[in-house]
A protein has these predicted regions:
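A short coil-to-beta-strand element that immediately follows conserved catalytic motifs
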Residues: 90-100
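Nudix hydrolase/Nudix homology domain
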Residues: 2, 59-60, 112, 118, ...
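Conserved Nudix-box catalytic region and its N-terminal flanking loop in Nudix hydrolases
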Residues: 42-85
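Conserved beta-strand and immediately adjacent loop positions that scaffold enzyme active sites
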Residues: 37, 45, 137
Length: 165
């Protein structure tokens, strides 16, 4: 699966699902949703954010930066927008952006299949993090810690999907 396949699925979903007043696709009551999953990397460490009680899924779990792909736009633009929104990291701090291989991840516990579009963003320097309402804490970890029990499931799989490209 590649970016064109993701956009094609997004367009099909946009035709059958409801929309918010601003035009974004509403995935609230659907069993399938495309998302970006962005790993911020600096000095061989990965930034994780602890999900707040104000998000709909995986409250209290550690995760990469994520967001619904709820309107047609290039995936890189969506990833960069989510990164700045959730952490305050701007384009000036970014050394490299890598799009991994998108894949489907079923989660039977919440009856939803995620179409995960993973990214790794390599930074030039360690940034000052400014969290928004979606997260309560942040930490830097080694990549081998991505599948710890307090992270969202298969987080390591999403990261690995970026290393194969």
């Amino acid at each position: 699966m590649d970016e064109a396949d993701v956009i094609s699925k997004l367009e099909a979903l946009g035709k059958k699902l409801p929309h918010f007043s601003d035009g974004r696709i509403n995935y609230t009551n659907t069993d399938y949703a495309p998302v970006i999953c962005v790993f911020i990397r600096f000095d061989n460490q990965i930034l994780l954010l602890k999900r707040s009680g104000k998000v709909s899924n995986y409250k209290g779990k550690w995760n990469a930066i994520t967001g619904f792909i709820d309107k047609p736009e290039p995936l890189k633009e969506k990833a960069l927008g989510e990164v700045e929104e959730e952490t305050g990291i701007t384009k000036e701090l970014i050394k490299e952006v890598i799009l991994g291989t998108p894949y489907e991840l079923p989660d039977d516990e919440i009856n939803k299949t995620w179409l995960v579009c993973p990214f790794v963003i390599e930074l030039n320097s360690r940034p000052k993090i400014k969290l928004d309402f979606e997260s309560t804490e942040y930490k830097w970890i080694k990549p081998e810690q991505l599948n710890a029990p307090d992270t969202v499931r298969d987080l390591g799989k999403s990261y690995a999907a970026c290393l194969k490209t």
